[in-house]
């Protein structure tokens, strides 16, 4: 499943190709995604200029403006479990899992295609007419926690928001209502770097341990973005390139292999129907 690094890699890859282009045409082949694509999406988007591309958690947010009226809205895109957004120089024949195309023109008349592909159809492409000020109140966004690269996210924030929480710290990280984007791979890796066992009740973490964890979360996610994300099966960036952070994982998907730090076999358990990997010697 694409997590925060994969979504951010996609966003950065789209920026130089998509921002400043006008939507000349929209083709929706399959509306049955996680939430149905609106019947009038084509009419809403046609002729609008893509002014910005932002990210909130695992959502990509494309601001699309009608230049004649300065009316702006947002295209919300979630990659689900297997989704990708590819920039294509032309429009090759669509495959069975290519659900939506945006045809984009620039001022010079050159044309590209932004193609949404999602074999399992757990992704989403939705239109919102909300203003920038109102967008945080969107039903899909209002319950999200702080961004891990926000200057306010630190050990004190994590410590304050985990008091009284008896759930395991990895489960709390995955919930996304305290801090967003720390998915399964990066939760296991962040906890390893912080030396914290994933089954530790979140409310029992000291301020010092929360400080280490907050730092580890930021460092792990930043490294993953630099490496182009993780490609376990389906993920590729907007240019079709695979990520390679998974090659540098300390514990994730390394059950039974020796810990890269101490040599103890990495242990695998299941938490909330998700696989967790950790070192019994390095994490306490």
Swiss-Prot record:
GO MF terms, alphabetically ordered: 8-oxo-7,8-dihydroguanine DNA N-glycosylase activity; class I DNA-(apurinic or apyrimidinic site) endonuclease activity; damaged DNA binding; zinc ion binding
Q: Which cysteines are joined by disulfide bonds?
A: none
Q: Name one Pfam family in it.
A: H2TH
From the UniProt record, list the reaction(s) this protein catalyses.
Hydrolysis of DNA containing ring-opened 7-methylguanine residues, releasing 2,6-diamino-4-hydroxy-5-(N-methyl)formamidopyrimidine; 2'-deoxyribonucleotide-(2'-deoxyribose 5'-phosphate)-2'-deoxyribonucleotide-DNA = a 3'-end 2'-deoxyribonucleotide-(2,3-dehydro-2,3-deoxyribose 5'-phosphate)-DNA + a 5'-end 5'-phospho-2'-deoxyribonucleoside-DNA + H(+)
So where's the catalytic machinery, residue-wise?
2 (schiff-base intermediate with dna), 3 (proton donor), 58 (proton donor), 274 (proton donor)
Domain of life, per UniProt, equals: Bacteria
A Gene Ontology annotation in the biological process aspect, one of them, is: base-excision repair
Cofactor note from UniProt?
Binds 1 zinc ion per subunit.
Sorted alphabetically, the keyword list is: DNA damage, DNA repair, DNA-binding, Glycosidase, Hydrolase, Lyase, Metal-binding, Multifunctional enzyme, Zinc, Zinc-finger
Give the enzyme's EC designation: 3.2.2.23, 4.2.99.18
Q: Which cofactor does it need?
A: Zn(2+)
Signal peptide positions (record): none
List of residues binding DNA:
97, 120, 165
DNA-binding as UniProt keyword: yes
- Note the zinc finger regions (FPG-type) by start and end residue: 250-284
Family matches, as HAMAP family: Fapy_DNA_glycosyl (MF_00103)
Family affiliation = Belongs to the FPG family.
Its biological purpose is as follows: Involved in base excision repair of DNA damaged by oxidation or by mutagenic agents. Acts as a DNA glycosylase that recognizes and removes damaged bases. Has a preference for oxidized purines, such as 7,8-dihydro-8-oxoguanine (8-oxoG). Has AP (apurinic/apyrimidinic) lyase activity and introduces nicks in the DNA strand. Cleaves the DNA backbone by beta-delta elimination to generate a single-strand break at the site of the removed base with both 3'- and 5'-phosphates.
Assembly and interactions? Answer: Monomer.
The protein in question is named Formamidopyrimidine-DNA glycosylase
In its UniProt entry, the species of origin is given as: Cupriavidus pinatubonensis (strain JMP 134 / LMG 1197) (Cupriavidus necator (strain JMP 134))
Tell me the organism's taxonomic lineage: Bacteria, Pseudomonadati, Pseudomonadota, Betaproteobacteria, Burkholderiales
